[in-house]
Amino acid sequence: MELLQPSADAAPVPLPAFLDFTPNAAAKVAALIDAEGNPQLKLRLYVSGGGCSGFQYGFAFDDQVADDDLQVVTDGVTLLIDAMSRQYLAGARVDYEDGLEGSRFVIQNPNAQSTCGCGSSFSV
């Protein structure tokens, strides 16, 4: 995994690990991007207000990279994180699970003081 941040000359600069975007999650994202038929897509992970615990995670495909986005690259797949969401996601792990309870992306976040039962919202 490699974390990239745009620099003044637009060339990505490697940074220390900010977030663990697992190979399993990257493989699932790659399959979803392939199904969309647009290789320019990246997965955006963001935090917004809402959910039963105050904040909730969201995912969306995006073909645009904002100037202040962090780019976490694993196995050639890019995960984008906006500046506001960064403060809530430092040290988190983004994984993909496929088990008896179904398939889903799972975020293990050391910044979350509590989470809801479904795991899609949290408080800090």
From Swiss-Prot:
One of its GO terms (cellular component) is cytosol. One of its GO terms (molecular function) is iron ion binding. The keyword Iron applies. One of its GO terms (biological process) is iron-sulfur cluster assembly. Its cofactor is iron-sulfur cluster. Iron-sulfur cluster binds at C52, C116, C118. InterPro entries: FeS_biogenesis (IPR000361), FeS_cluster_insertion (IPR016092), FeS_cluster_insertion_CS (IPR017870), FeS_cluster_insertion_RrpA (IPR023063), HesB-like_dom_sf (IPR035903). It comes from the Bacteria. Keywords: Iron, Iron-sulfur, Metal-binding. SUPFAM superfamilies: HesB-like domain (SSF89360). Binds 1 iron-sulfur cluster per subunit. NCBIfam families: iron-sulfur cluster assembly accessory protein, PRK13623.1. Belongs to the HesB/IscA family. Homodimer. HAMAP family: Fe_S_insert_ErpA. Required for insertion of 4Fe-4S clusters. This is Putative iron-sulfur cluster insertion protein ErpA 2. It comes from Burkholderia vietnamiensis (strain G4 / LMG 22486).
